[in-house]
Swiss-Prot record:
This is Uncharacterized lipoprotein YjhA. It comes from Bacillus subtilis (strain 168). It is a lipid-anchor. Disulfide bonds: none annotated. The keyword Oxidoreductase does not apply.
Length: 213
């Protein structure tokens, strides 16, 4: 659903940009190719929705590994390392304000995934943790968590100017010993939710996969 909302935002931006463009001279025989109208874009979105519930995101054709730096849209991305802890307390990201802390069970462990993002584009980007998704062998998403132990290191969100890097951690609770069956998915378009150049950034709507084995 979050992808649908983001795409609707793209439609709104596209309409605003079209309204601001100057009209061509009526006497000209050849006119520049016009941008699609909002109605046409909405029809395309509706078509995608009917196909599979929400517009399909492209998937990178490579499976990356821990320690590998690769280009993902307007960023260079690296999963530096993955640590495991088998005790301690945590809370769900996005949980209720009064939600109680949880304790790692005997058959569970918490993954602490350290990642680095580098902005290799010309414009600043606003990164956000919603651009990351941990999936199990059945392609099911795992809810992110946080612990006081990683205070100050959690990759929640911020602004990254051109040429700069940011390093932080993501955390998830999984069954003990099952790390090799999990994949971290990074989508630079979803991570950059506040870009001023949305039409360009939508090209970055690609899932990049990093196996955690």
């Amino acid at each position: 659903m979050k992808k649908v909302l983001l795409l609707l935002f793209v439609l709104t931006i596209g309409l605003a940009l079209s309204a601001c463009s100057q009209s061509s001279d009526a006497s000209e025989k050849e006119k520049p190719k016009e941008k699609k109208s909002q109605e046409e874009l909405e029809k395309e979105l509706d078509k995608e929705l009917k196909k599979g519930g929400e517009p399909k995101t492209k998937k990178d054709d490579q499976i990356h590994k821990i320690g590998e730096t690769f280009k993902a849209g307007h960023t260079n991305f690296t999963v530096n390392k993955v640590d495991r802890v088998q005790k301690g307390e945590y809370m769900n990201v996005g949980g209720a304000v009064n939600e109680e802390t949880k304790t790692i069970k005997d058959d569970e462990e918490r993954l602490i995934i350290e990642v680095t993002m580098e902005n290799i584009g010309e414009d600043s980007i606003s990164y956000n943790f919603i651009g990351f998704d941990l999936r199990d062998k059945n392609d099911q998403s795992v809810r992110p968590v946080f612990s006081i132990e990683e205070k100050g290191r959690i990759l929640m969100g911020g602004t990254l100017v051109s040429g700069k890097k940011v390093t932080g951690v993501l955390s998830y609770v999984i069954p003990k010993g099952e790390q090799k069956h999990y994949t971290l998915v990074y989508n630079p378009f979803l991570a950059d939710t506040n870009s001023s150049n949305t039409e360009e950034r939508v090209k970055d709507d690609i899932d990049y996969l990093v196996k955690l084995d």
